[in-house]
Amino acid sequence: MQVNPSEISELIKRRIENFDAAAEARNEGTVVSVGDGICRIHGLADVMFGEMLEFPDDTFGMALNLERDSVGAVLLGDYQHIKEGATVKCTGRILEVPVGDAMLGRVVDALGRPTDGKGPIKTEGSEPIEKVAPGVITREGVDQPVQTGLKAIDSMVPIGRGQRELIIGDRQTGKTAVAVDAIINQKDSGIKCIYVAVGQKNSTVANVVRKLEEHGAMDNTIVVNAGASESAAMQYIAPYAGCAMGEYFRDRGQDALIIYDDLTKQAWAYRQVSLLLRRPPGREAYPGDVFYLHSRLLERASRINAEEVERRTNGEVKGQTGSLTALPIIETQAGDVSAFVPTNVISITDGQIYLETDLFNSGVRPAVNAGLSVSRVGGSAQTKIIKKLGGGVRLALAQYRELAAFSQFASDLDETTRQQLERGKRTMELMKQGQYEPQSVGEMAFVLFAANEGYVDDVENDQVVRFEKALLDYLRAEHAELLQRITETGDYNDEIHAEMQKAMDAFKKNRTW
């Protein structure tokens, strides 16, 4: 074989011309120590706070401590393979999670990776988990209701779209049950739901998912699970990841509801991370910025006006407001709402639903304490008919609590006091509601109407629950059109009052309970 020198020189010339000698500047560092989900890195001079870091074998971390000669980072996911001396690279990005309609109906981890075995999720894009909350000018007032389907809440502590309403109580008082019922009631309302489970047992989360599937609510719900077996860093970022997924819907002129179950465990996870990073501890060993941890999260729940939606969608959506409603859950110890984290979150939110152990154990479920529960902005969002009828119920319960305490000491009570006590007892019974049994506005209105107008005064106390069930069965069979009309319009006037009275009189005449 003959080699032609001119061909070789031509080939070398072509190679030299095509050679790209551009230098690439990269910010790299070296692992100094690793353990307990925390990594200390030497180098990374230009790293930013909260920046995503790339470790070997597709492992990521987040820079949280920027010190003079090292960087403290939390590791997200498995870190057993990371050794001292390993190379760490800056990414120039902050942590992002996938968002979009494709996420609905799926169970994902804190980084948006599917964990339900249903294959990969094809989303339109991703959003950073940390965002600045909407400003005052871009917000709209809270004047549309979020119906939970629970009489005790919708009548006494109403929730509006864009509100933050805290659910607070000891362990085993039905906090998650209230939140799950609220999600189930949204299946036909068009409100998208996000359930963020922080530090829960995987079996508990699986049970919630199964219940949502059984009641047809999983199709418009995203479940973000950072279980008890996950690292503290994953539990810390999970609520922010869920919030970013909810903001996607809000910014497109839709309504979303997000449940954080629960923020106590997120605060514990953040405390653990902070102590491992050797940050100075404060009250109850929490770091100094634990208030900011929750305030920057909950301030992102809001209702934004139509101009802001139009700006965020580049003119695609016009004339529609968007909202993200938050129901954070806080677990108290022995009913102590004056502890550090509970007081922080109470001061951030627009009201709280206080669930009491004594009420729960005595069979009042949902165990809402009407005296300590309050909704600071929900009143203007409440449905007209429920607002009108619910006021009497709240008053009856308040008087009952006062008189019940007084009647323990007084032996002879006058007739008016006795009547108030009896009506209060029956109203308490009417406020009871089974789990996974949300009621429509029409059904709720009739139950409140029965309590207000004295239709249950002559019903035995132990028959009240049966009376309510029989009443609702009768109304669904005989007055379905009226129920539908009340649910759709929410109006309350003399005509509707007369129709409701007529239906109640006919039911009472039959005595079918």
UniProtKB/Swiss-Prot annotation:
Keywords: ATP synthesis, ATP-binding, Cell inner membrane, Cell membrane, CF(1), Hydrogen ion transport, Ion transport, Membrane, Nucleotide-binding, Translocase, Transport. The keyword Cell membrane applies. ATP binds at residues 169-176. It is a peripheral membrane protein. InterPro entries: ATP_synth_asu-like_sf, ATP_synth_asu_C, ATP_synth_asu_C_sf, ATP_synth_F1_a_nt-bd_dom, ATP_synth_F1_asu, ATPase_a/bsu_AS, ATPase_F1/V1/A1_a/bsu_N, ATPase_F1/V1/A1_a/bsu_N_sf. Gene3D superfamilies: 2.40.30.20, ATP synthase alpha/beta chain, C-terminal domain (1.20.150.20), P-loop containing nucleotide triphosphate hydrolases (3.40.50.300). One of its GO terms (molecular function) is proton-transporting ATP synthase activity, rotational mechanism. Its main location: membrane. Its EC number is 7.1.2.2. The record marks 373 as: Required for activity. GO terms for cellular component: plasma membrane; proton-transporting ATP synthase complex. It catalyses: ATP + H2O + 4 H(+)(in) = ADP + phosphate + 5 H(+)(out). The keyword Translocase applies. F-type ATPases have 2 components, CF(1) - the catalytic core - and CF(0) - the membrane proton channel. CF(1) has five subunits: alpha(3), beta(3), gamma(1), delta(1), epsilon(1). CF(0) has three main subunits: a(1), b(2) and c(9-12). The alpha and beta chains form an alternating ring which encloses part of the gamma chain. CF(1) is attached to CF(0) by a central stalk formed by the gamma and epsilon chains, while a peripheral stalk is formed by the delta and b chains. This is ATP synthase subunit alpha. The lineage of its organism: Bacteria, Pseudomonadati, Pseudomonadota, Gammaproteobacteria, Chromatiales.
